[in-house]
Amino acid sequence: MKIATLSIGDELIFGEVVDTNAAHISERLYSVGFKVQRQLTVGDNEQDIVEAIEMLAVKCDVVVVTGGLGPTVDDITARSAAKITGHELVLNEEALARLQRFSEKLGGNLHPSNEKQALMPANATLIPNPVGTACGFYLTHNGRFLFFLPGVPGEMACMLDETVIPFIVSRVKRRTFLQTKVFKVFGPSEAEVDALMDGVADEAAGVSVAFCVNFPEIQVKLRVEGHEEAVVAELLTRAGDKARQRLNGYVFAEDGETIDTVVASLFRETGFTLSLAESCTGGLVAKRITDIPGSSAYFLEGIVTYSNTAKTQLLDVPQRLLDEKGAVSSEVAVAMALGARKLSGSDIALAVTGIAGPDGGTAEKPVGTVYMALAGSNGCQAKRYTFHGDREEIRLITSFMAMDWLRKRLLSLRSAEVTD
């Protein structure tokens, strides 16, 4: 079954609002075995709406339309649907009754303009809206199923799950099962990842590979589809094992995990504690740590020492080092990490200092130069990196690299404990 989505609204065309509805519909349909073939967006123009629906209905069996069912003058989707089918707009008594009950529930009377939301083509079937005023409807046109839902994301999602998806599923005689596995990779380029994954896809068996760059990570997505759920699951497991082997060392998370949740899990598992000393990242690493609920169990302290004075007063960084080596140096990064660990009493301390730009770079230390240091019971190690991008990108990849270093250190410490 071929499915298309049509999103309606000038606010979408003008870039004032991001269209999350199309993405949600595609994701939900994919989860039950259907792939959206086409997505289209048009503004609040009757001719554009009519032409878009007619075009999509030629290519697809189902068209899910969102937006334009409100009470204002620019809400013209129902009128456009009536024009397509050649039926008049009529007042749907059930929709009107629902509107009245909803208004009374909110302690008011139904505004006359809201009655417009009860108008729909005479051949339409009502789709109830349990959480809002805009009822949807569906109808058939030249053998195609056309669904019309409100543009409010929460209302649309509820009606999609309660009416649209069950309807579509009931019309399919032989279901297709779709399963996905995601590997999140950090380090190699997209071209390098593509080369590593060569041979994993198997078109004949229904196994495909896709790549998505979500700076600074690369997501490798395995997709398997077939008519036997057990076979699909087995194929995905095999492909996943092969991909994991090919990407060995570069995978930091899988599926719904993130670098932040993985690091959090490792801290909880190992029982180690952490402190941070940040300069160029301005607390961004600490934010990533504390974004995860329960981080207070292992995160003791985070200090942003942006100025040299703060570095000396709060972290006991020797003024001599700052004068001789500069604030952006491996020596100062080490001193910051050791100072943070001493101050907090943590098992591990990580420090970051660098030049995020756009100014401040030199020939020896250009913009993007970052030093990190990681201190623990066995001493302190420092690393130098040279990142590229604008200020925001440099700060982002620096924080990501810091989290990845913590991940690798915790994995190493966990492995050492197991060996002991």
Curated annotation (Swiss-Prot):
Pfam families: CinA (PF02464), CinA_KH (PF18146), MoCF_biosynth (PF00994). Gene3D superfamilies: 3.30.70.2860, CinA-like (3.90.950.20), MoaB/Mog-like domain (3.40.980.10). Belongs to the CinA family. PANTHER family: NICOTINAMIDE-NUCLEOTIDE AMIDOHYDROLASE PNCC, NMN AMIDOHYDROLASE-LIKE PROTEIN YFAY. This is CinA-like protein. It comes from Geotalea uraniireducens (strain Rf4).
